[in-house]
Amino acid sequence: MAITKKLIDGLIVTIQNLYLTDDIPWMIGYSGGKDSTAAVQLVWMAIEQLPERYRKKTIYIMNTDTLVESPVVSKWVDKSLKFMKDESEKKGLPFVPIKLIPDYNNTFWVNLIGRGYPFPRKKYRWCTDRLKIQPVNNFIKNKIAEHGEIILVLGTRKQESSRRNRTMTNLEKKRVRELLSPNPTLANEL
């Protein structure tokens, strides 16, 4: 599918309509990669175009620092989050960039050296859950406890792989509201 101005304009209108539908806070997963950056950019453009009086619902931009990232990558992400925070405040936008970290009992080095876990590999990826997923899930659970439910925005592409395509197609079949699918692992997360 070609990316055109018409497509982007349509996405912006869809995002605006979803945003204005309710008071449920949004969370955007942001790694700094192309898919999550596109998701942040589209939501940002959509909300920025709304009149200020409608920009009331908080949108958290979540990044997880595994504490073993390259210093160059880590510094770039920190600058990116700071830039988003500063611009959001300057423009009266409801974005709250936040950097999450794993619990210190679940850091890479505690598990590798302290607990003797083998180095992560394709068939034994213990690090993904502990370093990235758990910090995000803990943050989301706290926000669900505070607000009742949340809407999670992820930048994903069906074209990334056949497995991703199947997963996304199956989630689309479970939609409970227009364009929103329930998270099978966390209650009250769409």
Predicted regions and their residues:
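ATP-dependent adenylation/nucleotidyltransferase module used to activate substrates
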Residues: 1-190
